[in-house]
Every structure is written in C-alpha cells, then in structure tokens.
Amino acid sequence: MGSHRTLAVTFAFASLVGVSTLAQAPPYGIGRTPTPEEIRALDISIGPTGEELPPGKGTVKEGGQLYRAKGCASCHGAAGIGGSAPNLKSKDPKNPDVWARGRILPLRAPFATTVWDYINRGMPLNQEGTLTPNEVYSITAYLLFINDVVPEDTV
C-alpha cells in the first residue's frame, strides 16, 4: 500500500511540475505584432452600397488579364472553374436560384462589394494586400462578367 501512495504522490507532483512548466513555455516567436497603422488599414467594413470603397475603377478586359497574370487561374482554373481552390464561376450561371441562395458567385457573396472586399483582403493567397484598388476592381468586374452578372463592357 505504501508504494501505491508514494507512486500516486510522485505522479501528482510530476503532473503539477509539468503543468507549471507548460504554462510558462516561451512563445513560439512566429510573426510580429501589427502596427496601429496596419490594423487601421484593415479595420474597415464594406457595405452593399460601396460607399466605404476606395476610389478606383477597372474593366472586365483588364480583370481577365490580371486574373491570369496575378496567378488566380493557377488555383481557381483558367475559366474560374476546375482548379484546386473553390470555383469562381457558377456551373449554371443562368440558374435564377443563384441570387436566391444569397450568392453572386459560387462563393457566399451576396453583393459585388463583398467580392471586392474578399479579393482585396485575402488574395492572392500568401500575397494578401498586394493588389491595388484598380486591380481589385478589374478582377471583380471579370468575375461578375464570367458569372453573367454584368456585361463585358462594364467599367
């Protein structure tokens, strides 16, 4: 019986020492704390009217060129479908239920401003924030065009 009690006390002590050691483990040291300016640049909300968007413009034609040049096609497929990343073109763009489901693309995006904001904040993957507002406007126009939301001459 004494050896069981000794074993239990030893185990309890080791557990407490182990937990306190883990609690004081140094941080991993990955990344850095963002500056106030960096936080302020991302701390925006984009509503459906687009009032909060920066000035800029883009065309469907420019968007198609940028879609290929910036590497969008390498993940999402040459025509916005069939890549390793989510499809950006509806398989049935004429389906009226696309709007009813709250989407203008196969992604969950109820407004064109949502598409703009997502691209601006999150694309290209691992190079987020590298697109200019005009590039984002152009790529957004291209995606809306390939989904039959806007005509090709949209600016």
Where are the model-predicted features located?
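Bacterial N-terminal signal peptides that target proteins for export
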Residues: 1-9
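Sec/Tat signal peptide C-region and signal peptidase I cleavage site
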Residues: 19-24
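Stable alpha-helical elements in mature extracytoplasmic
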Residues: 38, 59, 71, 111, ...
